[in-house]
Amino acid sequence: MGPQARTLCLLSLLLHVLPKPGKLVENSDFHLAGDYLLGGLFTLHANVKSISHLSYLQVPKCNEFTMKVLGYNLMQAMRFAVEEINNCSSLLPGVLLGYEMVDVCYLSNNIHPGLYFLAQDDDLLPILKDYSQYMPHVVAVIGPDNSESAITVSNILSHFLIPQITYSAISDKLRDKRHFPSMLRTVPSATHHIEAMVQLMVHFQWNWIVVLVSDDDYGRENSHLLSQRLTKTSDICIAFQEVLPIPESSQVMRSEEQRQLDNILDKLRRTSARVVVVFSPELSLYSFFHEVLRWNFTGFVWIASESWAIDPVLHNLTELRHTGTFLGVTIQRVSIPGFSQFRVRRDKPGYPVPNTTNLRTTCNQDCDACLNTTKSFNNILILSGERVVYSVYSAVYAVAHALHRLLGCNRVRCTKQKVYPWQLLREIWHVNFTLLGNRLFFDQQGDMPMLLDIIQWQWDLSQNPFQSIASYSPTSKRLTYINNVSWYTPNNTVPVSMCSKSCQPGQMKKSVGLHPCCFECLDCMPGTYLNRSADEFNCLSCPGSMWSYKNDITCFQRRPTFLEWHEVPTIVVAILAALGFFSTLAILFIFWRHFQTPMVRSAGGPMCFLMLVPLLLAFGMVPVYVGPPTVFSCFCRQAFFTVCFSICLSCITVRSFQIVCVFKMARRLPSAYSFWMRYHGPYVFVAFITAIKVALVVGNMLATTINPIGRTDPDDPNIMILSCHPNYRNGLLFNTSMDLLLSVLGFSFAYMGKELPTNYNEAKFITLSMTFSFTSSISLCTFMSVHDGVLVTIMDLLVTVLNFLAIGLGYFGPKCYMILFYPERNTSAYFNSMIQGYTMRKS
């Protein structure tokens, strides 16, 4: 025997074992005969869940419990909708809808009504191989009102694909159409209710809340959904969560339950949270709120789930206004014309009983006090806007529109025929109609995307007791139109419920304890900023080209700094460079015109041009130091100038060495001198030194880079120094060290030749040039070790220009002076006489 067969056998057994009720009045509030019957499940009497009635096989008598006004109000909505449809000529013309409605007594009476709706007129549920041709007592079921009951009934009806439309069961479990294929509902799911609550709390910046839940599936599921939703954001934290004790049907708490409730209230009094979210059926809250009043709580915000958000009995506890502000999530308000009068109307003789149905009886179809009790609450029901009533009303109309299509109705008549539940279910899934200005249809999960309202409880008799303050759309998932909130606080200020006050802009959060909502605020330091949308707990560093001040929320571009033409140091250096360029050009021209003279040959002859050309190029390339650095300018700074300078120094050094060799070493080492001259020793030496310098420069560039970068000014972080690679300074120091060595060598050789003939005695000129070069290089190295920034660039440029000027004017200047102003000394005879005089002095 398969699982489905075993289920059917059990259902048949229960149908026969459960007691038979008494006689039914023909056309009562619970029954209306018709061509097609709808089943209705409503809670007319309230009984909290206890295990006492489950210990024996007996249906409880619901009229022994407290009457529930809202349940009767919803049942009247179904009766009103059926009567309205039967009186409508355009919807189901010629067809009378009937109903069978049962009081499910909240959670106590679900199985028996389900079996009653399944069975045929003989109270039998046959076991068949195929139920596609089976016609149960009703074609569809409206209700019940809570998720536990809806799931229980759906587990029975789904086997037969009987359409079941619930009007207030919001459990997300019902969205699973594999387990509940025939379940639909005219309210949004619990996920949307939770989202509306969360957006409400975020809007008012309540991030420190208390959650109280009932000890049943409703409380557990909704609190779990809330916790899941809050894990997606750190904006809201739960200070603590407690389970409310559920009293027995007598509403009298046992001592253990009283202690549990006292502990909860004590924690609530001591917590800094002022927002309390309550997920519980209204039945469990009467005792709780009486205790809240006894403890004299004030200043709280109570957020109600849909189960008690518009409960008139709780609202009737007018002293609750002193405990704080009551907000709740419920279905949108839609006024139904004529329903308020119908609700309190005495029943009139019903429609004639068609031959297609027979009168049957079931239990819990009496409520003697319902009408009178409802009349006493009629005013508050009218002012509340008949919120959930519209969900029942639209559910009946959804069945009617589906039946209208299934029967092939036109404007005047319908084709009455057998209607099987699975056929009607298929049509219900595809209904799409307008009812009282609202477009109604079912989505893929079987939910009708109705709007939700955020309501506030009011106790002013002239106002709506459940005033709408905001609206939530399940389609857009957004909360809109938040207004008209009357806070029960001094000066009508928004209550504050925060574990920690919000940080100021530019302050990061540092968690304190386990909750992300509890934190201390720390300032973001200069150079960092806070991007709250990305990370509220860490200050982010600004990119290299940007900066920020203390407590900034964004970075700004640093002010770039580099040598510019309008600056005084740049102008001074440019004048010196121009002087060097034109003087070198003049020297080059003079030496070219007097190339064959003894003065030019004694200065080095062709080697002079090897010095003058790099000097001229170096002076011409000085502008690369000015303006934003580029790859080319960095290359020139790191390579071109130092190579040119090394060529000049090596030429001077080898020239000094060669003069000393001629006069002092040629006689002692004639073969060495002959070898030196035969193989062009001076040029080999210059080439060798140049090759070493090029190798050093290339190695330095390969080890670093020649790409310009921006660096922070150590004195002002707001300034970004645009310069070459930072290791450029290290390379410059290394290159300068080699130039210092050449300067020392040149100076040494020049000093050794201080006694040479006057025309060949260049010691004082070379000493001047080398000493200046040595001093300036030492000064540059010292300056670079102490300072940074644009000053280094200025100093580097100034030293470079002065070094070249020292060579150009210090070495070549005196020779040009002699050539131009003392031509008589620029003759071979004069030079020979000077050599003879030197020889005679030495001999």
Curated annotation (Swiss-Prot):
SUPFAM superfamilies: Periplasmic binding protein-like I, TNF receptor-like. Residues 20-570, 628-642, 704-731, 786-789 are extracellular. One of its GO terms (biological process) is detection of chemical stimulus involved in sensory perception of sweet taste. One of its GO terms (cellular component) is receptor complex. Glycans are attached at residues 87, 296, 316, 355, 372, 432, 484, 491, 531. Abundantly expressed in circumvallate and foliate papillae. Residues 592-606, 664-682, 753-764, 811-843 are cytoplasmic. It is found in: Cell membrane. Keywords: Cell membrane, G-protein coupled receptor, Glycoprotein, Membrane, Receptor, Sensory transduction, Signal, Taste, Transducer, Transmembrane, Transmembrane helix. Residues 1-19 form the signal peptide. Putative taste receptor. TAS1R2/TAS1R3 recognizes diverse natural and synthetic sweeteners. This is Taste receptor type 1 member 2. The lineage of its organism: Eukaryota, Metazoa, Chordata, Craniata, Vertebrata. The gene is Tas1r2.
